[in-house]
Swiss-Prot record:
Organism superkingdom: Bacteria
Pathway terms, separated by semicolons: Cofactor biosynthesis; NAD(+) biosynthesis; deamido-NAD(+) from nicotinate D-ribonucleotide: step 1/1
Pfam families associated with the record: CTP_transf_like
Class of enzymatic activity (EC top level): transferase
Catalytic reaction annotation: nicotinate beta-D-ribonucleotide + ATP + H(+) = deamido-NAD(+) + diphosphate
Similarity field: Belongs to the NadD family.
GO MF annotations in UniProt: ATP binding; nicotinate-nucleotide adenylyltransferase activity
Function: Catalyzes the reversible adenylation of nicotinate mononucleotide (NaMN) to nicotinic acid adenine dinucleotide (NaAD).
HAMAP family: NaMN_adenylyltr
EC code: 2.7.7.18
InterPro entries to which the protein is assigned, alphabetical: Cyt_trans-like, NadD/NMNAT, Rossmann-like_a/b/a_fold
UniProt name for this protein: Probable nicotinate-nucleotide adenylyltransferase
Lineage: Bacteria, Pseudomonadati, Pseudomonadota, Betaproteobacteria, Burkholderiales
Length: 212
């Protein structure tokens, strides 16, 4: 009897505050380029390296669920928002691999995360457990931090097109009184814009836009 083919699973973590078209394009690129059977979107619970307060986990997970519905192979993974304490990627990887020890695992990250990876909790163990799949900035190939030069040959570079979109810019636009629908389709998917409008997320304080 032939053995079942090894499942290829990607882990895609982030604050997703909010999820935007850059996230979606990167996810679709990863699935296609890495031939993934499944890509798990993992909203961070307690993002220990973030200096600002995140939107509630309920809303961030809700926006991710809206964004990925209908996309084959995409799955929302709530483990980090349901876990107590800081959201360490190594814990997520260990738990995932314990549940499916025979799968091949990929960690999908962007250039910014890649550059900070040597500051992550137990990062040396992390890079032995997964294949890093890295999207370069502005459509360029990713550049490794010096600590990762020795394992550069084991890293998958994801061919991302240049994209001028960020969660920071989206939040600033909405906080200044802009509408979510005006960000469609270049910055956010329609379903995410509808979710933002439905719950009045990132809106300026009641009483109007703060004075400049």
């Amino acid at each position: 009897m032939n053995a079942s083919p090894q499942r290829r699973i990607g882990l895609y973590g982030g604050s997703f505050d909010p999820p935007h078209m850059g996230h979606l394009v990167l996810a679709m690129t990863a699935v296609q380029h890495l031939k993934l059977d499944e890509l798990r979107w993992i909203p961070a619970g307690v993002a220990w390296q973030k200096e600002r307060t995140l939107l509630s986990a309920t809303h961030r997970a809700g926006m991710v669920k809206a964004a990925i519905t209908g996309h084959r192979g995409f799955k929302l993974d709530r483990r980090e928002i349901e876990r107590n304490g800081p959201s360490y990627t190594i814990d997520t990887v260990r738990e995932s691999q314990l549940a499916e020890p025979n799968a091949k695992w990929f960690l999908v990250i962007g250039q910014d995360q890649y550059e900070r990876l040597p500051t992550w909790h137990e990062w040396r163990e992390l890079i032995t457990r997964v294949t890093l799949a890295v999207a370069g900035r502005d459509g360029k190939s990713p550049s490794p931090p010096s600590e990762l030069l020795a394992v550069w040959h084991r890293i998958e570079a994801l061919p991302m097109p240049p994209m001028n979109v960020s969660s920071t810019a989206i939040r600033a636009h909405l906080a200044a009184g802009g509408t979510a629908q005006s960000l469609v389709p270049d910055m956010v998917p329609t379903v995410v814009a509808r979710y933002i409008d439905r719950y009045h997320l990132y809106a300026p304080p009641r009483g109007g836009v703060p004075a400049a």
